[in-house]
Amino acid sequence: LKCNKLVPLAYKTCPAGKNLCYKMYMVANKKVPVKRGCIDVCPKKSLLVKYECCNTDRCN
């Protein structure tokens, strides 16, 4: 699985066990992602941050 990094056009290959890509946003500003990468379990959203997870190459 390949997941996008925060830097445009950059991505990384996920290590074994991390089979989801994620994008993290601040709830106050949903247009600008704060963090992107590989993860094993999609975190729950909170009052301040929202996560979007997916399982195809560079889907984040």
Swiss-Prot record:
SUPFAM superfamilies, per database record: Snake toxin-like (SSF57302)
Pfam families: Toxin_cobra-type
Chief place of localization: secreted
Record bears the keyword Secreted: yes
Highest rank taxon of the organism: Eukaryota
GO biological process: one example: killing of cells of another organism
UniProt subunit comment: Monomer in solution; Homodimer and oligomer (homohexamer) in the presence of negatively charged lipids forming a pore with a size ranging between 20 and 30 Angstroms.
Family the UniProt entry places it in: Belongs to the three-finger toxin family. Short-chain subfamily. Type IA cytotoxin sub-subfamily.
Protein name from the UniProt record: Cytotoxin sagitoxin
